[in-house]
Amino acid sequence: MSKIRVLSVDDSALMRQIMTEIINSHSDMEMVATAPDPLVARDLIKKYNPDVLTLDVEMPRMDGIDFLEKLMRLRPMPVVMVSSLTGKGSEITLRALELGAVDFVTKPQLGIREGMLAYSEMIAEKIRHPSRAKLAAHTPLAAPDTLKAGPLLSSEKLLVIGASTGGTEAIRHVLQPLPLSSPGILITQHMPPGFTRSFAERLNKLCQISVKEAEDGERVPPGHAYIAPGDKHMELSRRRANYQIKIHDGPPVNRHRPSVDVLFHSVAKHAGRNAVGVILTGMGNDGAAGMLAMPIAGAWTIAQNEASCVVFGMPREAINMGGVSEVVDLSQVVSQQMLEKISAGQAIRI
């Protein structure tokens, strides 16, 4: 089996050296070349034909975003962004994901060499899964048609979503058409601290419903979506007749914090048949066990199909475990018919 061929673009000689060391330490991949900026990278891509590109966000001569936009239009390939953990860095990284980057790695703020080497296995996984993808010229997901507003839903109704790699754009596609009468929504997307706030703010500008980073103790009214903060678990709890968000620092589950399983298990316990669970694109198995618990408690569950996923790992694991009621294309995850059936309190059979 041939090795995954990686090309790294970063203006820092230290980062290029570290990335080379990390990639070459894994037997199934090799660093074929490195470049200090996108203009050099352009020629190296033609010469070495890499399977995956790692791309620094901020560089001289041409920044990573401008290069990514041209690359995805002219020669689409899996790209993993390398970003700083800053407010500006998170906004630029979200823009990169919108343009077609499949994932991102965050640079440690201190001890870059030690921190990056500690991330070695995670970086390898972020490269390994997208390397299998066959990308077409990138066309950003079009804004879906806005769904009609129905009667305001009972505060008992709930939509919960879990995602990882490729999830930022998939979540946007699900939330953007929702009317203000939609059920309350809880979302766990694997992201580090800082990024979740920027992600929520971006969605809030694009959507009719209100979207924000979740805070401990908040209620979950209709027409509002809450995103689990980076490095914190989010659970659903109850306070008398109302749903309430619980944010905590529990240990990572499935190597993740926030974890989709943590959210789904709590929703199965406290919402049961009033909930709809959705698992979107992502690698690994986080969410599979929690999704299995949801239909046992009476909920309806939906998995994104392989054709519309960036990485089919999380939906596949949930399907294989037996917790998925229905598998649909991303464009069909949320529909007018589904909202009407939730509103009527019917079991969902799309």
Swiss-Prot record:
Q: List-wise, which residues carry 4-aspartylphosphate?
A: 56
Which family is this protein grouped under?
Belongs to the CheB family.
Q: How is it modified after translation?
A: Phosphorylated by CheA. Phosphorylation of the N-terminal regulatory domain activates the methylesterase activity.
Which stretches make up the Response regulatory domain?
A: 5-122
Domain comment from the record reads as follows: Contains a C-terminal catalytic domain, and an N-terminal region which modulates catalytic activity.
> Gene3D superfamilies annotated for this entry?
3.40.50.2300, Methylesterase CheB, C-terminal domain
Q: Where is the CheB-type methylesterase domain?
A: 152-338
Cell compartment(s), UniProt: Cytoplasm
- What is the protein's name according to its record? Protein-glutamate methylesterase/protein-glutamine glutaminase
Q: Which organism is it from?
A: Enterobacter cloacae
What EC number(s) are associated with this protein in UniProt? Answer: 3.1.1.61, 3.5.1.44
Gene Ontology CC terms: cytoplasm
Q: Which UniProt keywords apply?
A: Chemotaxis, Cytoplasm, Hydrolase, Phosphoprotein
- Annotated active site residues, numbered on this chain, are 164, 190, 286
Q: What does this protein do?
A: Involved in chemotaxis. Part of a chemotaxis signal transduction system that modulates chemotaxis in response to various stimuli. Catalyzes the demethylation of specific methylglutamate residues introduced into the chemoreceptors (methyl-accepting chemotaxis proteins or MCP) by CheR. Also mediates the irreversible deamidation of specific glutamine residues to glutamic acid.
UniProt keyword Repeat present: no
The UniProt catalytic activity note for this protein reads: [protein]-L-glutamate 5-O-methyl ester + H2O = L-glutamyl-[protein] + methanol + H(+); L-glutaminyl-[protein] + H2O = L-glutamyl-[protein] + NH4(+)
A molecular function GO annotation: protein-glutamine glutaminase activity
The record's InterPro entries line, in alphabetical order, gives: CheB-like (IPR008248), CheB_C (IPR035909), CheY-like_superfamily (IPR011006), Sig_transdc_resp-reg_Me-estase (IPR000673), Sig_transdc_resp-reg_receiver (IPR001789)
Reply yes or no: does the keyword Kinase apply: no
Pfam families from the entry? CheB_methylest, Response_reg
Instruction: List this protein's GO terms for biological process.
Output: chemotaxis
